[in-house]
Amino acid sequence: MFEEENAQWGLVHALVLDGKGGARSIARTELDDLQLQPQESLWLHWDRSHPQTQTWLRKSSGLSEFACDLLLEENTRPRLLPLPDAELLLFLRGINLNPGAEPEDMVSVRIFAAANRVISLRLRPLRATDELLVQLADGKGPKTASELILYMAQYLTNKVQDLVTGLSEIVDSEEEKLDADERYTPEHGSVLQIRRRAAGLKRFLAPQRDIFAQLTRIKLAWFCDDDADYWNELHNSLTRYLEELELARERVGLVLEAEDRRLSLRMNRTMYRFGIITGIFLPMSFLTGLLGINVGGIPFSESPYGFMIACLLLVSVALGQWWLFRRLRWV
């Protein structure tokens, strides 16, 4: 309702959670005089690159200068930082699903959370927040501030699952093609991209998994009783996805090794055949060379059957070599 008006202030979404799974939008101008009911919570989602966002955060948010500096940092890694007064900073990463972007170029979302207030900042759009808005519009969204950050982490993790499944299916397909066709050559560029993508995802997801483990142990007064169980489940899910990413990297290595072995075997066979052919024709070339030298005359040069005799001699030598190679099991 107020999105266009709020956008000029850098405010992407401003919502008051009603404590029942729904939410109502508010305008940026209502923030200064906003009075929340006991069951309500405020969620402000800002565009970090907007100048008004930085101005509001430092002058009107009530956050410490230390917290503002961290929220506005250019480059961050997933981290969890408890603050005084039962507040916390939570930095997470999500899969980049924006058009033309690489998924492993993960999108950062920075979150300040307190008992009845959540402030989140992003630079690039996040699908996770869009899905969260749909849930709130249907009255099935988070009811409290603690549930809000939990839902956001859950949607971010679900996107990881979709990408990991897609990478595993690509590796499955390459393995099946290699098994079905000995002459199949995998596309090295696409296969290596899987390895690079898995490495890029692991860089941010590994510390994010540790953060979820930390959140299972944090006991803040405004956390719900079962929040720890949900954070633990997210930790287990992300651990499984990281294991699948590592497995995908190893399987890509095995695919490339199998292709290298096939190429090496094919090359060895080719060189072996050339060696056999050379072994057969080398003595024959030696004999024809001897027949061609003009020392004491050319044998059989006066005989009308000389050429035929020379040919029969060469054929006999070739057959003798073939028999010897067969006897030695070289062919």
Task: Annotate each predicted stretch with a short phrase.
Residues 1-224, 230-233, 237-240, 244-247, ...:
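Peripheral, non-transmembrane regulatory/ligand-interaction domains of membrane transport proteins
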Residues 236-331:
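Hydrophobic alpha-helical transmembrane segments and their immediately adjacent juxtamembrane loops
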